Amino acid sequence: MAFPAPAFSLANLLNGTYGVDTPEEVERVRSEQREEAAAACRNYKPLPAVDVGASVTEDAHSLRTPDGAPSEEVSVEFVTYGAEDYLEKSDDELFVAFETMVKPMCIGQLWCPAFNKCSFISSIAMARALLLVPNTPNRTMKCFEDLVAAIYTKSDFYYDDECEADDVQINISSRDVPGYSFEPWSRTSGFEPPPICEACNMIMYQCPCFDFNALKKSCAERTFADDYVIEGLDGVVDNATLLSNLGPFLVPVKCQYKQYPTPTVAIPPSLNRATDRVDINLVQSICDSTLPTHSNYDDSFHQVFVESADYSIDLDHVRLRQSDLIAKIPDSGHMIPVLNTGSGHKRVGTTKEVLTAIKKRNADVPELGDSVNLPRLSKAVAERFFIAYINGNSLATSNFVNVVSNFHDYMEKWKSSGLSYDDLPDLHAENLQFYDHMIKSDVKPVVSDTLNIDRPVPATITYHKKGITSQFSPLFTALFERFQRCLRERVILPVGKISSLEMSGFDVKNKYCLEIDLSKFDKSQGEFHLMIQEHILNGLGCPAPITKWWCDFHRFSYIRDRRAGVGMPISFQRRTGDAFTYFGNTIVTMAEFAWCYDTDQFEKLLFPGDDSLGFSVLPPVGDPSKFTTLFNMEAKVMEPAVPYICSKFLLSDEFGNTFSVPDPLREVQRLGTKKIPYSDNDEFLFAHFMSFVDRLKFLDRMTQSCIDQLSLFFELKYRKSGAEAALMLGAFKKYTANFQSYKELYYSDRRQCELINSFSCVELRIERSSFIKQRKKKDGIERRRNDKRRTPTSPHGGGEETETKVSQEESTGTMLQKSQRESAFKSQTIPFPTVLSSRRFGIDRDVPPRECGGIVRV
């Protein structure tokens, strides 16, 4: 006896009388379905033969047989089950069923749609009820699993007219990213595609209408991936191999980039023009007028004064170990510049110098921020970051590739330094909280007129060993490349082989500039900044265990300088030499900028590390005080603002293209550097020359309009004469012409010293005349002429005459150098032949001159 099915209503569904059946009712429904399936098999009549071009594969789960009959065997898979079967399952089993039916998509650490136990079971009960209700023959209702997904995502319950129930293939991406394919799940026949937004024809949880993107414009803009595509991929990507130390048998993944050819409307003409010859005295006069305190600056003995004077410093939790200090290795000397531009000598990492640098760079962390709810606010800042800068569609369709290839490239780069696959440490056995510390020997040139009252302090570097960095750097490099591909068109990160400061089709003239100078950027970062980075890394697709691990050993660390014997604990501040320094500084700067300013008001945004520059048509509106009150940064809005970033000015030519020009003031200072090592063949000087030429490759593009822009920007930034900047360009043109012109800027007194002190590397032979021998015999002293081992007597004896000869077979100089030395010796008229006493250097006078470096004059 067939019992009538309960009427479908929301009340019956909620009180349990509809959709939740008793075991007897379940058995009845199953038997009815078996009878209907068997009757369909008995009553089937084949249709007339029709010639079709392609066979159509039918799904075994479908009861509709438009082109063929189903199998005689009726599977139990056809029988639907009620919601009571799922009420008895655990949460894990329900989540597996949720993945099977709804088929959510994982974007970063988010499931779209999110899993809700109550909603999922209600959707199952609703689908069970809808299948029992007689439906209209006009449209075909979806099968059970797809119907559950449709109810859960609140989409259509019926198949489209043009789509069959067993073959629903819809492109889930609204715009293809060249070189990428996106498969969110391994689909079976009869699956329901994700819901599509009717307004923008995109996936519902990827469209701008959804809260994940929030802005329609963010998905409509071009990104980095639109201009650069992956040319080829070889091998298989495995993100876990980076931390598994698998060694050289890993298959590298090569990822090359190729830029789309852009149509050129006009070809810029060649602007190689003859310039006036520049005298070196003119360049020195420019330095004297532009940098008045630099012309007489000489720090040759400044560090000696620091080491020998009284020293007082106030630091907390510092450990000093002065027993096993590493002695400084003496170098072979440096080239001496002709120009005096205020450049300093190299700094030696002594204990006092390191303590002074730590005091300024690492200690005395400012406490400028207010008390805030760190978890809630850090999550809000990270969400604002993704809304302001990230194209959500590109992030969902981009792949995380090239990790293993970056790992092999890193190992190949440092192979000459002794780094090999066998020497890689086990990261789980290493204490990653310990960092090495050192100071930079090269001090950054100072452009302010304060050298007469202030001594520059060197920067510090906090770093891990190469064995540890080699395992983290490839991961962050690949993640940074993915981050670049997902940025909106207006955002530029000038780093790497592709992205640079050159912008075609963008003119910096008639634009408002916004430049934020963040002081004490590294040591001002705290727990708030670390939590922001953790949320952003998880959102970009970094594995959550690695992100958590990386942030844990950045909460508290210990730095130690072995050469100086100094150690100190630090907390959340930025490590200036690890694998995440540039990437971390960039995302922190971008997050702070997006929270203080509305990024939609800017046409271009540049974020290289801790620098930032924005261009807008209208005056920028924002609240820069939040840099201090919220993010604990000492921020200063540069006024007047000029297009200046990374020590470069941005200029636009007549064709509307923007290119970068190094700061002329800093380039002139580099011409007077005292850090070029001496070499006999000038190889180090030539390397500096090639670097100088590469930095000044813009000279061929400098028209009169560009020179006028540079002069104006130079005056606004430094409040100095812009005409001197034009004169500096003439000097650059001369010294980039050839290497011989560049050599005029440096000299070395090493060769002149070698002409005089020729006993440093050869044996000294003393021959005495018969007059001296007869005189010695009178004094009762007998010496043999051929005795080469004895040291000559006191050179200050009255009336002595010695003849010094250097054996030709042991001399390394040429005949020309020998004649020059002899002529130099003969030209000196000295009444008494003397040998410079070794007592002047604090050495016993009985030591031979060749051992103590004394100078013999005849």
From Swiss-Prot:
Interacts with replication protein 1a. Residues 809-818 have a biased composition (Polar residues). CDD domains: Bromoviridae_RdRp. GO terms for molecular function: nucleotide binding; RNA binding; RNA-directed RNA polymerase activity. Signal peptide: none annotated. Its EC number is 2.7.7.48. Belongs to the ssRNA positive-strand viruses RNA-directed RNA polymerase family. Residues 775-830 are annotated as: Disordered. It holds the Pfam family RdRP_2. GO terms for biological process: DNA-templated transcription; positive stranded viral RNA replication. It comes from Cucumber mosaic virus (strain Ixora). It catalyses: RNA(n) + a ribonucleoside 5'-triphosphate = RNA(n+1) + diphosphate. Disulfide bonds: none annotated. Residues 798-808 have a biased composition (Basic and acidic residues). Residues 511-624 form the RdRp catalytic domain. This is RNA-directed RNA polymerase 2a.
